[in-house]
């Protein structure tokens, strides 16, 4: 459960991304695909070469979904219900991939925002991403 301080940290960090959300989302996906090769089986025939439009486009979708989540911290299940259905029933993404992507996103944010990425912000973002992952995997059965 996110505390009031966690919610403040998440909203503040997300606000500081500015227009870089899609870029950081794509970078995090690239990190995940390179660091965890088994994740490459899920983005159905993505061209994973550097600068490819497919990971860039999916990175934008990831960033937009996380921005939606950051704006609805008190109702993550409601805000992410359609996305949870999509990943569980249509895409059938391995639930482990959400944890791996969360890790890669934390690394990406730390690399681009070192001054803002304090231990408290790190902990809050980690809890936030874990909560998002839990919601996205809630309809897997």
Curated annotation (Swiss-Prot):
Gene3D superfamilies: Globins (1.10.490.10)
Modified residues (Phosphotyrosine): 24
InterPro entries: Globin, Globin-like_sf, Globin/Proto, Hemoglobin_a-typ, Hemoglobin_oxygen_transport, Hemoglobin_pi
Modified residues (N6-succinyllysine): 7, 11, 16, 40
Family: Belongs to the globin family.
Entry function: Involved in oxygen transport from the lung to the various peripheral tissues.
Tissues of expression: Red blood cells.
Phosphoserine: residues bearing it: 3, 35, 49, 102, 124, 131, 138
Record bears the keyword Metal-binding: yes
Name of this chain's protein: Hemoglobin subunit alpha
Residues that, per the record, bind O2: 58
Keyword terms, alphabetized: Acetylation, Heme, Iron, Metal-binding, Oxygen transport, Phosphoprotein, Transport
Signal sequence segment: none
Keyword Metal-binding: yes
Entry-annotated residues carrying N6-acetyllysine: 16
Phosphothreonine: residues carrying this PTM: 8, 108, 134, 137
Subunit structure: Heterotetramer of two alpha chains and two beta chains.
PROSITE patterns named among the record's database cross-references: GLOBIN
UniProt-listed Pfam families: Globin (PF00042)
